A protein has these predicted regions:
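Gram-negative outer-membrane beta-barrel transporters
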Residues: 98-100, 196-207, 227-313, 341-343, ...
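Signature of Gram-negative outer-membrane beta-barrel scaffolds
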Residues: 37, 61-140
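Outer-membrane beta-barrel translocator domains and adjoining extracellular loop/strand segments
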Residues: 28-37, 75-83, 114-122, 157-164, ...
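Transmembrane beta-strands of outer-membrane beta-barrel pores
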Residues: 22-28, 70-76, 106-114, 149-155, ...
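Membrane-embedded beta-barrel scaffold of Gram-negative outer-membrane proteins
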Residues: 136-138, 144-148, 154, 174-234, ...
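Short loop/turn motifs that connect adjacent beta-strands in outer-membrane beta-barrel proteins
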Residues: 9-15, 57-61, 97-101, 137-143, ...
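C-terminal beta-signal and adjacent terminal beta-strands/loops
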Residues: 209, 305-312, 328-377
Length: 377
């Protein structure tokens, strides 16, 4: 892919920004199993994107913005599908005495889709509002209470709609009403060994209509896509971070994250799985990360844990899926040659070479290695 950005301050109060992007993806699926129908499908997906955003400062503490985004997607070879998506947004943000910040926004989404070999997915139009609040009750302390309400709208992707023989061109968009309340507290102690500490937590509630989910059909690459009529989601996210300045200019950063989530299907009280946890969503998950930094070198360790869950809609013993956890290690070196920035990395994933399935009957690789080099001009 290739992308670019242009930003310009027209006046001291008015600024504009333009983003451009073009991407191309090539996927080939071949099935030579003589017991099944021979399959050799090629998918070529192209994406063009342009965004134009403008911001005007009415006062030093009051901004308004208007933006237009356009995205073109094309899928060809095995099937020919084209989608034009337009987003028009307007937002305003203001602060009161540097302790209360408010942002209000509205987003209009317009989708026009054409499929040449099969029925078109219906065109869509939707307007979704959002409001974000941030309050700092103590001026001298970095303690923030935050809350938001957001109405979101998610279109099915081409993968959801067309990539499989069982694709559903009439898969409905997913809509959600999201409520969130949380806090963030920072302690900055420059010059000390224990130089920074952060703790935060959020409680949230989402009511999702036509939630898009995928079930593996037993053959890799192929999934059954469907909508769950109504899903009730509530949970807690908590995280901490600490930074230590050690001798010899070594910096140690540690992060802990924990999530509790209940996501239950409340579509129809007559269903056997009514108020059961939806497939592959664990109640408990978390991660721990440690990073050592020294003179452009970074040594990272991460531990990820995902609790038990169910692989089908009914929460019965037969559908129980065990928890899994894994450890990864990476070593990264960044350096600069004149104006060119380079980064070299070595990763060891699944360090303990454990057997685990994220999706039932789809075993993940044992210990594996990855090497990478990136160049930024």
């Amino acid at each position: 892919f290739v992308q670019g950005m242009f930003e310009y301050d027209i006046t001291s109060k008015l600024s504009t920004k333009v983003n451009l992007k073009y991407a191309f993806d090539y996927t080939r699926y071949v099935n030579n199993d003589d017991k099944l129908i021979h399959v050799d499908n090629i998918y070529k997906q192209r994406e063009g994107y342009i965004s134009w955003a403008n911001k005007y400062s009415i006062l030093s503490n009051w901004d308004v913005s208007v933006a237009y985004d356009y995205q073109w997607n094309g899928l060809s070879e095995y099937t020919s599908v084209f989608r034009n998506t337009h987003w028009i947004s307007a937002a305003t943000a203001f602060s009161i005495k540097n302790c209360l910040k408010v942002q209000v926004a509205a987003l209009a989404t317009i989708v026009d889709e054409e499929a040449r070999e099969r029925e078109n997915a219906p065109n869509k139009k939707k307007v979704t509002p959002a409001i974000f609040l941030s309050y700092k009750p103590i001026r001298k302390a970095d303690f923030i209470i935050r809350a938001f309400y957001k109405h979101s709208y998610r279109m099915p992707t081409f993968n959801d709609l067309y990539y499989t023989d069982m694709g559903n061109a009439y898969l409905r968009p997913e809509t959600a009403k999201q409520y969130n309340l949380g806090f963030l507290y920072d302690i900055d102690r420059k010059g000390h060994t224990f130089s920074f500490f952060r703790i935060g937590a959020d409680i949230y509630y989402n009511r999702v209509k036509d939630k898009i989910v995928a079930y593996p059909k037993g053959q890799q690459f192929r999934w059954t896509m469907l909508n769950l009529g109504e899903v009730d989601i509530r949970g807690i996210d908590a995280q901490t971070m600490a930074i230590f300045r050690l001798p010899y200019k070594i910096e140690l950063t540690t992060k802990l994250q924990y999530t509790y989530q209940e996501a239950i299907d409340i579509t129809n009280p007559a269903d056997n799985y009514y108020r059961d946890q939806i497939p592959y969503i664990p109640w408990h998950s978390g991660s721990a990360i440690a990073m050592l930094s020294w003179k452009g070198w970074n040594l990272n360790y991460s531990f990820i844990y995902v609790g038990y869950r169910y692989n089908q809609q009914e929460n019965i013993r037969y559908n129980y899926t065990q928890p899994w956890y894994t450890s990864d290690v990476s070593l990264i070196k960044t350096f600069k040659i004149k104006r060119t920035h380079l980064k070299a990395s070595v990763e060891v994933n699944n360090l303990l070479s454990q057997d685990y399935d994220v999706i039932l009957n789809y075993p993940m690789p044992k210990r594996n290695y990855r090497f990478g080099i990136s160049v930024e001009l």
